[in-house]
């Protein structure tokens, strides 16, 4: 019983990494993996074009996106591709952030030539954007302003329609944090999608606007509590079984995980009534 008491009285402090959770859906969606954009040769198992990305706003969320893109762009590329991964990071504090990144992640110094930090305030920057929009595969707009992110994302999408080849895939991710604003952004993204598709299958343009980072989803039960709650339930069930001498004689499996699995198997053997006692996550 002391084990049960300890489980119930242990104080818990949970630190929520909102930046990491903001990009979770992007990271876990196969459609948004860098491999989609590099024209993979499935016969040879290599990428036939480099992967180029732009990150606008290099705060916590921008840095999480960079980590994801840097890690998942590590593929086998064709021999004639000298710079397989390029990332353009645009932030008013570009120079300071560049030094901070290199000090935190010294391992990327050998890839320094692939990283381009830009403040975005020069007079020639509009011309630089016109060149970038023709070539990059992936744009993430993640400043602190939902309205600003959506507005800039739409401007970049319109620029792509004017300047970019229609068959070159481009995804523009916009950080939208408020629930109502996220719904509006999703409506706008669907509008663009519907009006750049001919019939049910034919895409006139391979460009898309993708909102991400809704706070309501970030602080959901599934993200914040589900895993911890199930683990505590396993431990509680294990300790509780030890007290049920009349049924098990104090004998349990070797660890909470095995005892939990045995519980699920027993319920499944009971048929539908037993299945109703098991949560969907367990099944």
Q: Where do the PLM segments sit?
A:
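Cytosolic regulatory regions of ion transport systems
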Residues: 1-283
């Amino acid at each position: 019983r002391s084990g049960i008491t300890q489980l119930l009285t242990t104080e818990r402090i949970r630190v929520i990494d909102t930046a990491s959770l903001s990009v979770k859906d992007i990271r876990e969606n196969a459609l948004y993996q860098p491999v989609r954009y590099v024209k993979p040769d499935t016969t040879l198992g290599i990428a036939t074009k480099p992967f180029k990305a732009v990150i606008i706003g290099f705060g916590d969320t921008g840095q999480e996106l960079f980590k994801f893109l840097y890690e998942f762009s590590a593929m086998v590329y064709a021999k004639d591709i000298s710079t397989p991964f390029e990332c353009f990071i645009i932030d008013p504090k570009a120079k300071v952030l560049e030094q901070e990144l290199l000090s935190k992640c010294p391992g990327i110094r050998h890839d320094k030539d692939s990283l381009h930090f830009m403040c975005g305030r020069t007079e020639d920057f509009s011309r630089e954007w016109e060149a970038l929009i023709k070539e990059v595969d992936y744009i993430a707009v993640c400043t602190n302003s939902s309205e600003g992110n959506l507005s800039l994302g739409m401007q970049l999408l319109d620029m792509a329609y004017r300047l970019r080849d229609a068959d070159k895939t481009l995804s523009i991710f916009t950080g939208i944090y408020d629930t109502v604003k996220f719904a509006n952004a999703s409506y706008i993204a669907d509008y663009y999608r519907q009006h750049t598709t001919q019939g049910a299958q034919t895409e006139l343009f391979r460009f898309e606007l993708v909102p991400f980072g809704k706070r309501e989803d970030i602080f959901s039960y599934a993200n914040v509590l589900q895993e911890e709650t199930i683990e505590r339930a396993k431990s509680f069930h294990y300790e509780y079984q030890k007290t049920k001498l009349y049924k098990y004689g104090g004998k349990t499996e070797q660890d909470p995980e095995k005892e939990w699995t045995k519980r699920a198997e027993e319920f499944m053997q009971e048929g539908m009534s037993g299945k109703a006692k098991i949560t969907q996550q367990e099944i």
